[in-house]
Amino acid sequence: MKIISKKYRLELYSMLVDLLNDNIPLYDALNKIQNEGVGIYDKNFIKSIELIKDRMKSNSSLTDALTGLIPDKEVLMINVAENSGKISSGIAAIRKNIIDADEIKSKAISSMITPSVMLIVTMVVIAGYSVKVFPTFESVLPVSRWPGVTQALYNLGFSLYEGLWIKVLIFVAIFITILVFMSKNITGNFRDGFLDKLPPFNFVKHIAATEFLANMSMLLDSRVPFKEGLDIVDHKTTRWLSSHLQRMKANMQEGLDYKQALDTNLLDKKMLLTMAVYSELPNFSDVMQKLAIEANINLHKKIATLAGVMKNISLITLALSVIWIFGAIFSLVDKLSSSL
């Protein structure tokens, strides 16, 4: 069977949480979802529910029943929740983490839509003037005698029309691919001391810190020791995040306190201080959850700020292009007048 799609995993998790909170046994909850979902949900999803039920007939473990049907990381989290007896809250936490991650991704993509549209509009306007407007002046005055500002605009527009825009898109795609690769794999002092202070690496760091706090909160709430929690979070993660987690584990093995052990440049100083103060208290998992919520709110604010900055930059770029076009036209008209 294929992995259940994110859409249906969220549906499944939501219904399971509601039914389990109403004290309906797990198998009965799955049976109810299957029976009521026929004709509403996708056939493959219903088959997946049936497979989960069949697996649970021979093994009551939900973890084993879901293995291969959901991502390994979610399997690990459900296993922890199941072993702790807090399966409902564990599934709810997994669902929330997925929704939060999707929301952040959606806002990040949305923040780039306006600049992208503005860039395309700018290229179309420049190409349009070069192809439709400026050629009418060629019969009156050779291009070689046009003002420099007009020649530059004319040549750029024709280059865009003849395929430069494709090269621009390819360059942007390659650049983004390189950035994604670097954000997942580059580690060390150069990453910690320099790259992580710049976009998009600082956003990657903030997202990772938020997810780390949310996951550790759930694991601690399920009575998983902190060191074991780090191993679970480290499962199938990026090379960059794994390097932080490995350093945390090494620091804890040396007997350092939380503030020192977790100081790998992933978490900010305020987070580290809060964790150090509350680490020995029974409600430490609640404190971690609060930190995760605060980090998530701050991340949304940063993305909103970035979106505003990018929008302003794109508007300025478009405005400068329009000024360039009118300047080129007026310069050309003035040149023509003086040549007559």
From Swiss-Prot:
The chain crosses the membrane at residues 108-131, 146-161, 312-333. It holds the Pfam family T2SSF. GO terms for cellular component: plasma membrane. InterPro entries: GspF/PilC (IPR003004), T2SS_GspF/T4SS_PilC_CS (IPR001992), T2SS_GspF_dom (IPR018076), T2SS_GspF_sf (IPR042094). It is a multi-pass membrane protein. Keywords: Cell inner membrane, Cell membrane, Membrane, Protein transport, Transmembrane, Transmembrane helix, Transport. It is found in: Cell inner membrane. GO terms for biological process: protein secretion by the type II secretion system. Probably involved in cholera toxin receptor (GM1) interaction in order to bring the cells within close proximity of the ganglioside for efficient toxin delivery. Belongs to the GSP F family. This is Toxin coregulated pilus biosynthesis protein E. The lineage of its organism: Bacteria, Pseudomonadati, Pseudomonadota, Gammaproteobacteria, Vibrionales. The gene is tcpE.
